Swiss-Prot record:
<dbReference type="GO" id="GO:0006096">
    <property type="term" value="P:glycolytic process"/>
</dbReference>
<dbReference type="InterPro" id="IPR023096">
    <property type="entry name" value="G6P_Isomerase_C"/>
</dbReference>
<keyword id="KW-0963">Cytoplasm</keyword>
<keyword id="KW-0324">Glycolysis</keyword>
<keyword id="KW-0312">Gluconeogenesis</keyword>
<dbReference type="GO" id="GO:0006094">
    <property type="term" value="P:gluconeogenesis"/>
</dbReference>
<dbReference type="GO" id="GO:0097367">
    <property type="term" value="F:carbohydrate derivative binding"/>
</dbReference>
<dbReference type="GO" id="GO:0051156">
    <property type="term" value="P:glucose 6-phosphate metabolic process"/>
</dbReference>
<dbReference type="InterPro" id="IPR001672">
    <property type="entry name" value="G6P_Isomerase"/>
</dbReference>
<dbReference type="InterPro" id="IPR035476">
    <property type="entry name" value="SIS_PGI_1"/>
</dbReference>
<protein>
    <recommendedName>
        <fullName>Glucose-6-phosphate isomerase</fullName>
        <ecNumber>5.3.1.9</ecNumber>
    </recommendedName>
</protein>
<feature type="active site">
    <location>
        <position position="512"/>
    </location>
</feature>
<dbReference type="GO" id="GO:0048029">
    <property type="term" value="F:monosaccharide binding"/>
</dbReference>
<dbReference type="InterPro" id="IPR035482">
    <property type="entry name" value="SIS_PGI_2"/>
</dbReference>
<feature type="active site">
    <location>
        <position position="386"/>
    </location>
</feature>
<dbReference type="GO" id="GO:0005829">
    <property type="term" value="C:cytosol"/>
</dbReference>
<keyword id="KW-0413">Isomerase</keyword>
Length: 547
């Protein structure tokens, strides 16, 4: 049975709050409540989250919590954590939260001791990562491993690539990580051209070991390695490991199945960075820091599972997104980390959020009655300020934005004078942007500065641009885990309100099937007959210019 949120009383209340918020400004909201920042700031899992620069007030937050309760949010959170099959289209549990269970936790799902299974794989990952880091794992020529190349796509790439970059200062064992995902041969060439096969190890990440792009890249890497080893196929077992559940295909490739690390069908790819998919990350930062990474996830899980909705950060942020998406008509959401090391975080969130909530039917197959799925995008600050912030400040579109910053840098440099801190300069920009977006600058204020009348309108900053500020003390493994889990749970909250399945991705599957169907024609092996004239003409043009 479907849940139509638009028929509920809290939805009607939220519509009234939208009308009220449209008629006010953030300047007015702050002026009327000196305690606003304190009342709308929250702490959980080492994160400080300030929601005060959003277009909400106490009555709006009350409507959020009422709507969450009306949707059965608490019961649905419990169902996910308990391993019920909430992914109804694939009849699966959704248990990424189990990947970070404590070692003494108990969770049995579908007759399996999930906690024990998770920690068995983690133990094997620790042993493998330790062997790379202490030099006991040797390649075909007895060299130690200096570079680990992760070959995967989607969730098998974006998560570990993002996290490895984010935690680069924790790479203490001299092991470098590179990532290949695109079936475009330029991706593999660019990586292999820099590497020494004797000291390179490949992690092939594919649950089924049949993913088209991943297998194409894996075989290219295998040919490169075997050629360097003088044609010795046995070298493969010393330079390849797999993250997969298909032992037969893994062995057929030449990988020793003792070096195959599994995960489960209750883990979606975009939720898998803290599973065996994180093997490359663990190898780079070490098992201890990887466990701290999991601790951060678990701390946010516990907050989400137990906190009252009035102070539950993922619930409030998820409801904010619904509010902006369905009432204000905001179609996009900017994520702006003021941390170069978090530069891949917006791309990671694109898959997490858009693959999860880019749906147009509800659980029962009926059409949704709301807008769903914001478009996520962003770049690190301050780069974004000199690229697209102009549109956020003075454009005609409302673009809610999340600003992410840290109190202490892992590394710092002096400013141009040699006396100040570049990190302080970075954060000065961070605070200035959220201030200007919220409060802007009026025509009267600009005119009072002596600006010529013909320029006043051009310089007006409307303000009232909503932002959420997320801060942590440092970008640590714990903080990154908590940050990822925060957004995972935001996705869940939105999915509950919209009554969509956030854990399937049929739109991705059809594209894969069509690509396989068209491949023979694209390769010139069969006549072009795709079923539509446009695709036929495009493939024919491609073939005629391919040479």
């Amino acid at each position: 049975m479907s849940f139509d949120v638009t028929t509920t009383e809290p939805w009607a209340t939220l519509s009234e709050r939208y009308t009220a918020m449209k008629a006010t400004t953030l300047r007015d909201l702050f002026a009327s409540n000196p305690n606003r920042a304190q009342e709308l700031s929250f702490e959980a899992a080492g994160l400080h989250v300030d929601l005060s620069k959003n277009l909400i007030d106490a009555e709006t937050v009350a409507a959020f919590t009422a709507l969450a309760k009306a949707s059965g949010m608490r019961e649905k959170i419990k169902a996910m954590f308990d391993g019920e099959h909430i992914n109804n289209t694939e009849d699966r549990a959704v248990l990424h939260t189990a990947l970070r269970l404590a070692v003494d936790a108990e969770l049995n799902v579908d007759g399996q001791d999930v906690a024990a299974d998770v920690h068995e794989v983690l133990g094997r990952m620790r042993d493998f990562a330790t062997s790379l880091r202490n030099g006991s794992w040797r390649g075909y020529s007895n060299h130690t491993i200096k570079t680990i190349v992760n070959i995967g796509i989607g969730g098998s790439d974006l998560g570990p690539a993002m996290a490895t970059k984010a935690l680069r200062t924790y790479a203490t064992a001299g092991i470098n990580a590179k990532f290949v995902s695109n079936v475009d041969p330029a991706d593999m060439h660019a990586v292999l051209d820099e590497l020494d096969p004797e000291s390179t190890l490949f992690v092939v990440a594919s649950k089924t070991f049949t993913t088209q792009e991943t297998l194409a890249n894996a075989h290219a890497a295998k040919r490169w390695l075997v050629a360097a080893a003088g044609g010795d196929e046995s070298a493969v077992a010393k330079h390849f490991v797999a993250v997969s559940t298909n032992a037969e295909k893994v062995a057929e490739f030449g990988i020793d199945t003792k070096n195959m690390f599994g995960f489960w069908n209750w883990v979606g790819g975009r939720y898998s960075v803290d599973s065996a998919i994180g093997l490359s990350l663990m190898s780079v930062i070490g098992p201890m820091d990887f466990m701290r990474f999991l601790d951060g996830f678990r701390a946010m899980d516990e907050h989400f599972r137990t906190a009252d909705f009035e102070s539950n950060i993922p619930v409030l942020m998820g409801m904010l997104n619904v509010f902006y998406n369905d009432f204000f008509g905001a179609e996009t959401h900017a994520v702006l980390p003021y941390s170069q090391d978090l530069g891949r975080f917006p791309a990671y969130l694109q898959q997490l959020t858009m693959e999860s909530n880019g749906k147009s039917v509800r659980h029962d197959g009926s059409a949704v009655t709301t807008n769903t799925g914001e478009i996520y995008w962003g770049e690190p600050g301050t780069n974004g300020q000199h690229a697209f912030f102009q549109l956020i400040h003075q454009g005609t579109k409302l673009i809610p934005a999340d600003f992410i910053g840290f109190a202490r840098p892992k590394e710092d440099l002096p400013t141009a004078s040699g006396e100040g801190s570049m990190h302080d300069l970075l954060m000065s920009n961070f605070f200035a942007q959220t201030k200007v977006l919220a409060f802007g600058k009026t025509a009267e204020e600009i005119a009072a500065e002596g600006v010529s009348p013909e320029l006043v309108a051009h310089k007006v900053m409307p303000g009232n641009r909503p932002t959420t500020t997320i801060m942590a003390e440092e970008l640590t493994p714990f903080a990154l885990g908590a940050l990822i889990a925060l957004y995972e749970h935001i996705v869940f909250v939105e999915g509950v309100i919209w009554d969509i399945n956030s854990f399937d991705q049929w739109g991705v599957e059809l594209g894969k099937q069509q690509a396989n169907d068209l491949a023979p024609a694209v390769a010139g092996e069969v006549a072009v007959d795709s079923g539509d004239s446009s695709t036929d003409a495009l493939i024919s043009w491609y073939r005629s210019h391919r040479g």
